[in-house]
Design a protein with these regions (language model features):
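Polybasic, glycine- and aromatic-enriched phosphate-binding surface used to engage nucleic acids
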Residues: 1-159
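Non-catalytic DNA-recognition/assembly elements of restriction-modification systems
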Residues: 6, 14, 155-205
Length: 205
């Protein structure tokens, strides 16, 4: 229950499903103890940004956090656009760039200007991504960050991303209000599948 001491919304993987949060709990925060006395804390800016929340076991379920900015435990990963971390100086960010990217941090910040979180979550929640993950994971029940990094992200014109963004917000709204969103989810999944189809110019090469 939210009170004067337990002020920060908190999630675990069992609290989320595709495009929805099923349950919210509250942690002590902004007190003399927390977060100042936490052991090995992650950097605050990771949580205080719009992000995609991803479970790390079983079938992938992603939801959008573009308002509340939840805290979460180790059963969840979160994905933040590089442009939204511009100016944040942190050793783990520098290490990630050096270890996992062929591009500079500045380049990735520029690349991320061309996509929105709604577009990325639509890809991650798609049937196509589920197939790719099944291939990447084999018999492994875990979803690791490298699995997510290895999902190719097709480029899409802004008009397509705008339509996808609208559908994502529609699905989220329908789920929050208990409305049937099957038709919207089907349309969204078909749009994502279409993006992965080779175009005629690719087939002629």
């Amino acid at each position: 229950t939210k009170d004067e001491q337990h002020t920060r919304e908190y999630l675990e993987a069992k609290d989320i499903e595709k495009y929805a949060v099923k349950r919210v709990r509250y942690l002590e925060y902004d007190t003399p103890r927390c977060p100042g006395e936490l052991s090995r804390p992650t950097f605050r800016e990771l949580y205080d940004r719009d992000k995609i929340i991803i479970n790390c076991l079983g079938t992938i379920n992603c939801t959008l956090d573009n308002n509340i900015h939840y805290l979460h435990n180790h059963s969840i990963y979160c994905a933040v656009l590089w442009k939204d971390l511009k100016g944040v100086d942190n050793k783990s960010l520098s290490a990630s760039v050096k270890r996992y990217s062929h591009h500079s941090r500045k380049e990735m910040e520029e690349f991320s200007e061309a996509v929105c979180l709604e577009y990325l979550i639509a890809i991650l929640n798609s049937s196509y991504a589920a197939q790719l993950l099944a291939t990447l994971r084999g018999d492994d029940y875990h979803i690791y960050p490298e699995h997510i990094r290895n999902i190719p992200i097709p480029s899409a014109p802004s008009v397509v991303q705008t339509r996808i963004k609208h559908l994502v917000h529609q699905i989220i709204e329908y789920k929050q209000s208990g409305k049937d969103c099957i038709a919207s989810e089907k349309e969204l999944d078909e749009m994502i599948l279409e993006l992965y189809k080779p175009d005629d110019s690719d087939e002629k090469k």
